[in-house]
């Protein structure tokens, strides 16, 4: 793979060559620091100071050139504004056409400047990561924090493209006013809903979107999905080349089929929750065996996530076909277990359903095949489909209140979820076979691991100690064997990449070795919230029947209402709260709220009431939803870039952590059932409380490294 140094040289704008980051010089300087430290000619503080000074100089050069170009663009726009004013008094169609072309020419030059900024931003991120990798020290966070927060920050100029918004606005507004050659002047401010059909403005908007990493609802929802992305090579291409490269891979109907698969699988997961205890008792088992029935699907998913993730390296269509067939038969077995009076058949059916979990394929399709400009929306759609399926599953179960037989086959509230889902998967299979298009793959396509584009520009990789002084007390230079492993050839600037430093992890052990303490804590938090949510949902029918005598319909309504909170809560957090507070602050506050919800759920001395259960359940569930979104947002930033590709990627690790939590939670419910239903609630909540307290302590310990 051609590395960044050569790409920068090939794709830089020739007349602006001297204003780009001198990546080769910076890289060579990093290489020289090693021997100098070994012989004692330089100490650690001097290295950090010297490297910071060099990088400051490079950023200043870039920032000042940006300001100069902004000034030139602004001057041209001012002259065009004067020309525009004269045409308002005496409209001339030919002059209006020329004026539009003049604005488009400015827009094209603005695109060049945005591409210049993009290349330099990538270069700065890469050289910071190279310094961290070579010396085993997380310098990135210290540098970014001290420079970005300064009132006269030049780093902000580069990464936040300060001032360019006014230029973009001027071009967009004037082209919008001139879009009608009849002389009708329409303002984007007065009528913002009016579409502007101009390819230049569309290209500018896409370029700005690539550079902008501000938090909003779609961004928050996209990170909630933890779609691991690897598009740095693509980002460094001009927009027209990006579109050409993406063409042939994206197919709207195929994306829709992946989202439908996500939705149906979540419906399949939760449709049995309200009736699992009743089904278990009808087969002669205890009500608490519902934990095993519900958890069997999660057990199988532990294995299916791995082989589906590996299978998606070669195909997307075949795994989805296999998933649909397995889920069809799984639901068929689940429904037939009633007439065969077989608990074993019931569990086998649920295991089959778990073996059909293709969520890894759904995630992978979005990260690999959906164009950058709509990937955030697609990722948010993945989360929304999951949330909608989670809400619709129990609601659908509540509607299946009937009991009849056709020949010797029973259709009642216990078996109908299986029959309905079997039909749904059969119809989906037909739709899939007709409409899905396998994406085009490049010859010898290699999924290499680079910096994830979902990573916030300002975050870099997390500093494990969050303190520059603490870092200075550690050995700055790693063993020569390790540094040589990551070194790149500087002879001709071609920068051959080290295979080991870029290739994806090839096993769980290799993936685990890439996990920093910050990432481990985030996975622990994910485990905790999934455990707490599974306890709440899976035992709801048993607990509410025992304490309140709720019917299956009442349980369905309760679970449906819980599911409906997912999207509104994420909307509030993604659009408002995350703009007022840091992610790590929201993370810690959400953990505390989950802990409060768990504590309030305990049955201690006083009679257990419906308001106590419902209020504590909503506090726990809503807080866990907020926590999940923020947790995955942070996880996508602090996780190694090598985990953005391959079979054992970050998405798989988080899925496995959550699935293991669900398996243990469901097993806990069944085991606690041996102590009697009166003890079930408190016994299952106690592990949740312990894990939650541990996760809060771990978060406090790594708080300074969560950026």
Swiss-Prot record:
Gene Ontology terms, MF aspect: transmembrane transporter activity
Question: Which is a GO BP term held by this UniProt record?
Answer: transmembrane phosphate ion transport from cytosol to vacuole
User: May I have one GO cellular component term?
Assistant: plant-type vacuole membrane
Looking at the record, which segments are called Disordered? 481-503
Query: What membrane topology is given?
Result: Multi-pass membrane protein
Q: A Pfam family matched by this chain, by name? A: SPX
Q: Mind telling me which residue stretches traverse the membrane in this protein? A: 252-272, 283-303, 320-340, 342-361, 380-400, 416-436, 523-543, 557-577, 586-606, 614-634, 679-699
State where it is primarily located: membrane
Query: Would I find Membrane among this entry's keywords?
Result: yes
Which segment of the chain is annotated as a signal peptide?
Answer: none
> InterPro entries this protein is in?
MFS, MFS_Domain-Containing_Protein, MFS_trans_sf, SPX_dom, SPXM_SPX_plant
Keywords, A to Z? Membrane, Transmembrane, Transmembrane helix
Where the record annotates domain SPX, the positions are: 2-145
- Compositional bias of type Acidic residues: which residue ranges? 481-498
**Localisation per UniProt entry:** Membrane
The entry assigns this protein to a family as follows: Belongs to the major facilitator superfamily.
Cross-referenced PANTHER family: INNER MEMBRANE TRANSPORT PROTEIN YAJR, SPX DOMAIN-CONTAINING PROTEIN
> What is this protein's record name?
SPX domain-containing membrane protein At4g11810
Instruction: Name the source organism.
Output: Arabidopsis thaliana (Mouse-ear cress)
Q: What is the lineage of its organism?
A: Eukaryota, Viridiplantae, Streptophyta, Embryophyta, Tracheophyta
């Amino acid at each position: 793979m051609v590395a960044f140094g050569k790409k920068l040289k090939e794709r830089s704008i020739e007349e602006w060559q001297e204003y780009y980051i001198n990546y080769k010089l910076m890289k060579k300087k990093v290489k020289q620091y090693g021997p100098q430290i070994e012989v004692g000619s330089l100490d650690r503080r001097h290295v950090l100071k010297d490297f910071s000074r060099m990088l400051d100089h490079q950023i200043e050069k870039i920032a000042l050139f940006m300001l100069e170009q902004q000034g030139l663009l602004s001057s041209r726009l001012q002259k065009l504004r004067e020309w525009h004013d004269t045409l308002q008094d005496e409209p001339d169609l030919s002059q209006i056409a020329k004026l539009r072309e003049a604005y488009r020419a400015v827009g094209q030059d603005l695109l060049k400047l945005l591409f210049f900024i993009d290349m330099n931003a990538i270069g700065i991120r890469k050289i910071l990561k190279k310094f961290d990798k070579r010396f085993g020290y997380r310098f990135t966070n210290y540098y970014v924090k001290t420079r970005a927060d300064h009132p006269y920050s030049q780093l902000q100029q580069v990464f936040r493209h300060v001032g360019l918004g006014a230029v973009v606005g001027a071009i967009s507004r004037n082209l919008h006013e001139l879009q009608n050659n009849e002389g009708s002047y329409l303002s984007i401010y007065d009528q913002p809903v009016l579409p502007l059909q101009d390819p230049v403005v569309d290209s500018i908007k896409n370029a700005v979107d690539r550079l902008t990493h501000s938090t909003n609802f779609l961004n928050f929802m996209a990170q909630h999905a933890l779609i691991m992305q690897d598009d740095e090579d693509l980002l460094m291409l001009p927009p027209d080349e990006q579109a050409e490269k993406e063409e042939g891979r994206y197919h709207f109907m195929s994306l829709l089929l992946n989202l439908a698969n996500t939705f149906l699988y979540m419906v399949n997961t939760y449709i049995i929750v309200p009736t699992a205890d009743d089904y278990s008792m009808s087969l002669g088992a205890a009500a608490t065996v519902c934990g095993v029935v519900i958890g069997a699907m999660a057990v199988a998913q532990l294995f299916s996530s791995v082989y589906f993730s590996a299978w998606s390296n070669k195909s997307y269509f075949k795994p989805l076909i296999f998933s649909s067939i397995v889920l069809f038969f799984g639901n068929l077995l689940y429904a037939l277990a009633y007439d065969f009076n077989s608990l074993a058949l019931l569990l086998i059916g649920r295991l089959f359903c778990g073996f059909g979990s293709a969520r890894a394929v759904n995630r992978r399709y979005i990260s690999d095949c959906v164009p950058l400009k709509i990937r955030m929306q697609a990722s948010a759609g993945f989360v929304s489909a999951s949330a909608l399926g989670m809400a619709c599953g129990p609601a659908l179960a509540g509607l299946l209140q009937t009991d009849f037989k056709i020949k010797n086959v029973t259709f009642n509230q216990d078996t109908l979820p299986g029959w309905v889902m079997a039909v749904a998967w059969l119809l989906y299979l037909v739709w899939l076979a007709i409409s899905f298009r396998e994406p085009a793959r490049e010859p010898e396509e290699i999924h290499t691991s680079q910096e994830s584009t979902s990573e916030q520009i300002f975050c870099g990789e997390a500093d494990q100690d969050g303190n520059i002084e603490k870092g200075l007390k550690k050995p700055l230079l790693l063993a020569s064997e390790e540094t040589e492993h990551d070194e790149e050839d500087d002879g001709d600037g071609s920068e051959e990449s080290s295979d080991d430093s870029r290739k994806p992890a090839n096993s769980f052990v290799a993936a685990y070795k890439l996990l920093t303490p910050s990432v481990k804590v985030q996975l622990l938090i994910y485990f905790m919230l999934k455990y707490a949510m599974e306890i709440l949902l899976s035992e709801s029918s048993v607990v509410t029947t025992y304490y309140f005598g709720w019917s299956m319909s009442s349980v369905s309504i309760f679970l449906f209402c819980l599911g409906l909170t997912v999207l509104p809560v994420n909307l509030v957090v993604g659009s408002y709260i995350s703009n007022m507070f840091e992610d790590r602050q929201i993370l810690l506050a959400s953990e505390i709220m989950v802990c409060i919800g768990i504590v309030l759920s305990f049955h201690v001395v006083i009679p257990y009431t419906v308001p106590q259960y419902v209020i504590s359940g909503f506090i726990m569930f809503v807080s866990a939803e907020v926590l999940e979104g923020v947790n995955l947002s942070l996880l996508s930033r602090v996780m190694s870039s090598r985990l953005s590709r391959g079979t054992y990627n970050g998405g798989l690790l988080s899925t496995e952590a959550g699935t293991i939590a669900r398996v243990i939670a469901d097993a806990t419910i069944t085991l606690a059932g041996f102590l009697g239903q009166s003890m079930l609630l408190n016994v299952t909540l106690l592990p949740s409380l312990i894990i939650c307290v541990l996760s809060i302590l771990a978060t406090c310990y790594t708080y300074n490294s969560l950026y």
